[in-house]
Curated annotation (Swiss-Prot):
UniProt name for this protein: Probable glycine dehydrogenase (decarboxylating) subunit 1
EC number: 1.4.4.2
Keywords: Oxidoreductase
Quaternary data: The glycine cleavage system is composed of four proteins: P, T, L and H. In this organism, the P 'protein' is a heterodimer of two subunits.
CDD domains assigned: GDC-P
GO molecular function, one term: glycine dehydrogenase (decarboxylating) activity
Membrane as UniProt keyword: no
Record-stated family: Belongs to the GcvP family. N-terminal subunit subfamily.
Superkingdom of source: Bacteria
Catalytic reaction annotation: N(6)-[(R)-lipoyl]-L-lysyl-[glycine-cleavage complex H protein] + glycine + H(+) = N(6)-[(R)-S(8)-aminomethyldihydrolipoyl]-L-lysyl-[glycine-cleavage complex H protein] + CO2
One Pfam match: GDC-P
GO BP, one annotated term: glycine decarboxylation via glycine cleavage system
Amino acid sequence: MRYLPLTENDRREMLGVIGAKSVDELFRDVPERARREGLVDLPRRQGELEVERMLGRMAAKNTPAASVPFFVGAGAYRHHVPAAVDHLIQRSEFLTSYTPYQPEITQGTLQYLFEFQTQVAMITGMEVANASMYDGATGCGEAVLMAHRVTKRRKAVLSGTLHPQYAAVVQNLSDFADYELEVMPPALPGQAEDILAHIHDDISCVVVQTPGFFGELHDLRPIAEAAHAKGALLIAVVPEILSLGAVTPPGEMGADIVVGEGQSIGNGLNFGGPYVGLFATREKYMRQMPGRLCGETVDADGNRGFVLTLSTREQHIRREKATSNICTNSGLCCLAFTIHMSLLGEEGYKRLARINHAAAVKLAERLAKVPGVEILNQAFFNEFTMRLPKPAAEVVDALVDKGVIGGLPASRLLPGVAEVEDLLIVASTEINTEADRAAYEAALKEVL
């Protein structure tokens, strides 16, 4: 007996229900240039060895971050990950585990999530943290939705310090969640952003990033005071979580919700994902927090144990009452974060942050000596922005030809903004050596 799960009649019936004439109509949003007609012309009857060689030749056309001096950041940072991290997360109990619905058989998973939450709460200066989001951007979007629930208001203000891709996620949610956004223009380093003038009685929250998209560190205290005076919440976004080892945590500056990207700890660049979103808030807002919360308890015999304390998502309760519809979280990335953070310890975390800051300062001092280069930042962590005498995209391409990946042209994420055409965002971490910095300085002198 043959099982045919989708016949032509099935397709016609399904298309009729949704009002589409053909399957192709379902993909009309995909640009024509991105579509492929027919089968891919692959070589036939190749053995495993031949396939490996062919793929190796294709891969050799790329320039891996580890093979050249690499100075790209802007939300994804290359840090050293201890070998112990990957070794431990590949244990089958962790690698293939699922959501810990049955605490009697998932104590290991629940405990590391509990430890993860504790670490996130400590470094952000908040009282409670959840068991992670998909990434920093989705965490930011969920934070805005949470602020609406808490304040019963429907308008948010996005600072120009916010990463454009984070802002795009929030804007995407606003289109479907029926709330209003006020998006401020990019906050260039050295230029004061008049965000206080945009905080009114009708807003639910103000979203500010530190370090900002251009690397600038920001004092959140005056913004927090202004927001609280109007009954609004302050959402602090931290795309480089290692920075909290060197600066005052957002929670201590008055933030009500802190979201961030945890990729820098325990995780590689991973081709842009999967990453691990961090989400922390104050205890009084805990029941409005999205995602899951693991808690500590005791069993019937008085033994310490861990459980899913809160999990108010649409799978468990009525959709209209759920705080989010987030499903499988970034559990394995959480574990990598937790292991790396445990290996570092509090002092190691702070020391690594100091090393990163020193690396960026040394690079900025070198590049500032190059004729035509201007460092714009007054205060930064491990990332800064410089103004060049020609378009930054052209300079980056020329640097690649010299064997240096020199940073991210701001225009790549802010197309059409004339003020950023000559701005290059540069990151330097503990990975970068003095030889890397010297190579960058020499290459930049040549291409300018």
